[in-house]
Amino acid sequence: MKINKYKITAVLFLVIIFWIGTVTLWNNRTEFKNMLHSGDVINETNKIYSENVAYSDTFIDMWSKTQSVTDVQLLDDAEYGNIIKDEKGNLYFPANDVDVTSLAENTINFAKMLSEKNIKFAYVQAPNKDLKGYTDKIVSDYNFSNKNADEFLSILDENGVDTLDLRELIIKENLDREKLFYKTDHHWTTTTAFWAYNKLVEYLNQTYNLNIDPNNYYRDINNYNLTEIKECYLGSLGRRVGKSVSGLDDYTFIEPNFKTDYKIYNGVTSKTNPIFKGNFHKAIVKDNILTSNDVTSNKHATYFEWDYGDLIIKNTLIDNDVKILLIKDSYSLPLAAFLSTCISELDMVDLRDTPKVDLQKKIADGDFDVVLVLYNTEVFNETMFGFDIK
């Protein structure tokens, strides 16, 4: 008699789900008793189960591992539908095919407005894990981020907007694509961010004659301390499928070995009282994340910790008077940390934050040399491109 592994798997998981439900009910019996008197049985039940379900981490691990055993490359996920796993073990979010026309028009109008104020503008396209010529076809079948980015950049180029496509430089320089991204997270590694920081400064100097770091001192990796921490990081994707399926990533911490001094302000709350100050480590690095033994701690956020709505970073030891406004997503956290070492002021704005920053006022008051928008290929939505042109 031939054993059907799929039927056995289904039966086992029905038994496990029943057991988990029973244990959760018993562990939260007091909450359920109170819920019966609350008048909102359905919502309260959902809340209790979602917040207190027994063995949740173990269940995620077991379910994902079972899918791997049954040769599934699309791992179930409640929020995204599927998490994609390629043959190299990399995990990916899916990304929809987006009509980027209106987003490109917003960006073109934003660039025109800045030009009228004699402020330079460039759109910088950060890569996504779905890399041309490297990623398995199954990823491109479910992730349209590169297609969206290609169409977006094409419209900008046709309208004379300055762009820097880091994806093309990865191909041109034949970088080791195994080391560009974390396997378990959607972000680039710190070493990739450092490379991108170098390319960005080169571009700014060549395109706008800013003369940033003319001696290449602050961009020389030999002037930084690198500390590699082995198997310490379970990223955003790995947390969704379980570490038994994804494994753990190594993390490389990079910080200057030269003298630094900063004053950092939260532009939303106070532009006069710094929230952080001191050298690079004291002002920018978050030891609670860096030294945490919890593998789910977000190592990517070791620099700055949060995606602040408006963060003003002043380097008191640099006197080149270069001021840059960086409109960003979370990819920019490590890159911005490195960029801050070689310019007088770097302001970071994240349009996802609420209350939303008044960009027009910030630009009018800021006296910026350059405004940059630096996004990865998966953020083509109205929020990220809502520049509020007036």
Description of each model-found segment:
Residues 1-390:
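Extracellular glycan-modifying ectodomains
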